[in-house]
Amino acid sequence: MTFNFISFCRIEVILPCQIYSNTSIPLIWKIVLLGDGSFTRHCQIITYRDTEINHISTSIYSKVHNSPQFYVNRRVWIGNNLKNKLIFASSWWNIESYQAIYKYPSRAIGSLFIQSDLDYYRDIHCLFLGYSTELENLFLVPGPFWGRYYTLFYKGKPISLIYEIFSPLLENFQ
């Protein structure tokens, strides 16, 4: 499940530094998009509900045919116990990092790091806002949709590239 906003909808790419002082962007989106903490924890606070992870798939790919370098792609829906889909997340890991750190595909990455007391940080590369008929059908709500992608670091080394798309329903919990 890959979404290419450019091919089927309008999109605006926004740098993280453009969000801070923009008064037209609701505070909820600033917190969700720029927060350094676990989205799963933020989701619990925002919605006053436990979050649920719906594991879509975990696949292994090689970068080049017959290459010894393998990558893991994990895709999940995160929602609350009202069964709302609030986020789609796709993460790419080198297989060594994935096997060393991530043992339970049905657990949220943020929860894993928090409960394990692992020190990690993220470097947000890009934020985007756009409309997509495909996303409206998957989330079952009209757009626009915010999204971001970032690199996750552990012990100063990159371990994962994460791509997230957020449901407009998050605005209802303000």
From Swiss-Prot:
Alphabetical list of Gene3D superfamilies matching this protein: Chorismate lyase-like
Chloroplast listed as a keyword: yes
Keyword check for Repeat: no
Predominant place of localization: plastid
Protein's cellular compartments: Plastid, Chloroplast
Pfam families (alphabetical): Rv2949c-like
Domain of life of the native organism: Eukaryota
GO cellular component: chloroplast
Keywords carried by this UniProt record: Chloroplast, Plastid
Family named by the database record: Belongs to the ycf21 family.
This protein's name: Uncharacterized protein ycf21
Species of origin: Pyropia yezoensis (Susabi-nori)
